[in-house]
């Protein structure tokens, strides 16, 4: 596995692969890799000739008071995992390389899709995401880029950006990977105390309960949301950020559950904010 910290060298490598007719997959990550990330890597390995994984904890997608400084990092362990998965190139640039002192260019998707859910509680977050992802696409020149369904809103925003700015690549969605007890895998799970970890299982339980309600004929969004709230509020350490039930294609509001429905939530346990979601076909 080749390791690149320099942007120009990464671009030269990517150009060389293209010249040789090789297809390139990109898996963008912030590191501290777990099985969820490795599922993206495995899918990329199956579909493309060359696999690039980027590791960059992106400061501009963290707001004031968020966990940028504390975000877990272990490049040595990450590199070993990626070697095992036969990744061709690891791109891990420094902050000053990605954002020199004079940096003033941002890529932002406007509208309802970025204003609700995580966009409402983390202003500027998605602007940071779309800016860094645009840069990674230009640097690594992938034919396909792999994103996890756990960050459903982010995934849809990136898809919209790619479509509207005509990036010559395909976004591949990869299903959520869960622990045996149902908790969605996340690098932030390491922050949880044993008590918080036990309570965090309520996220998936609430989602499955909502799915069951819909399958049993409930169509009223307010009723489903209220039942989810009651279940989560029964956990003393849980503080709900949002529970959203929206159109799974574009995050638009639904009057009642119909078509493809995304049920998504964000809940804090202590200082740790966790997200999860599932899609129900009605």
Swiss-Prot record:
It is an enzyme of class 6 (ligase). One of its GO terms (biological process) is pantothenate biosynthetic process. GO terms for cellular component: cytosol. Belongs to the pantothenate synthetase family. Pathway: Cofactor biosynthesis; (R)-pantothenate biosynthesis; (R)-pantothenate from (R)-pantoate and beta-alanine: step 1/1. Gene3D superfamilies: HUPs (3.40.50.620), Pantoate-beta-alanine ligase, C-terminal domain (3.30.1300.10). It comes from the Bacteria. GO terms for molecular function: ATP binding; pantoate-beta-alanine ligase activity. It comes from Syntrophomonas wolfei subsp. wolfei (strain DSM 2245B / Goettingen). The active site is at 37 (proton donor). Beta-alanine binds at residue 61. The reaction proceeds by a bi uni uni bi ping pong mechanism. The lineage of its organism: Bacteria, Bacillati, Bacillota, Clostridia, Eubacteriales. Homodimer. Catalyzes the condensation of pantoate with beta-alanine in an ATP-dependent reaction via a pantoyl-adenylate intermediate. Its EC number is 6.3.2.1. It is found in: Cytoplasm. CDD domains: PanC. The keyword Nucleotide-binding applies. It catalyses: (R)-pantoate + beta-alanine + ATP = (R)-pantothenate + AMP + diphosphate + H(+). This is Pantothenate synthetase. (R)-pantoate binds at residues 61, 154. Its main location: cytoplasm.
């Amino acid at each position: 596995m080749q390791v690149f910290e320099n942007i120009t060298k990464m671009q030269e490598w990517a150009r060389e692969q293209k010249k040789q007719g090789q297809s390139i997959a990109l898996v963008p990550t912030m590191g501290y890799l777990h099985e969820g990330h490795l599922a993206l890597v495995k899918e990329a390995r199956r579909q493309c000739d060359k696999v690039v994984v980027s590791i960059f904890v992106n400061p501009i997608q963290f707001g004031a008071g968020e966990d940028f400084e504390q975000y877990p990092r272990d490049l040595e362990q990450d590199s070993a995992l990626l070697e095992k998965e036969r990744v061709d190139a690891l791109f891990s640039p420094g902050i000053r390389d990605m954002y020199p002192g004079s940096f003033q260019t941002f890529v932002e998707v406007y509208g309802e899709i970025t204003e609700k859910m995580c966009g409402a509680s983390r202003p500027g977050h998605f602007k940071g995401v779309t800016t860094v992802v645009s840069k990674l696409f230009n640097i690594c020149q992938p034919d396909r880029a792999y994103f996890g369904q756990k960050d459903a809103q982010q995934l849809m925003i990136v898809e919209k950006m790619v479509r509207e700015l005509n990036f010559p690549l395909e976004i591949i969605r990869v299903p959520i990977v869960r622990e045996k007890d149902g908790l969605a895998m996340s690098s932030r799970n390491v922050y949880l105390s044993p008590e918080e970890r036990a309570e965090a299982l309520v996220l998936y339980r609430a989602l499955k309960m909502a799915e069951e309600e819909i399958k049993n004929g409930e169509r009223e969004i307010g009723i489903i949301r209220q039942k989810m709230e009651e279940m989560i509020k029964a956990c003393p350490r849980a503080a709900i950020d949002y529970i959203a039930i929206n159109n799974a294609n574009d995050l638009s509001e639904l009057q009642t559950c119909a078509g493809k429905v995304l049920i998504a939530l964000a809940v804090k346990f202590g200082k740790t904010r966790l997200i999860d979601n599932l899609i129900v076909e009605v």
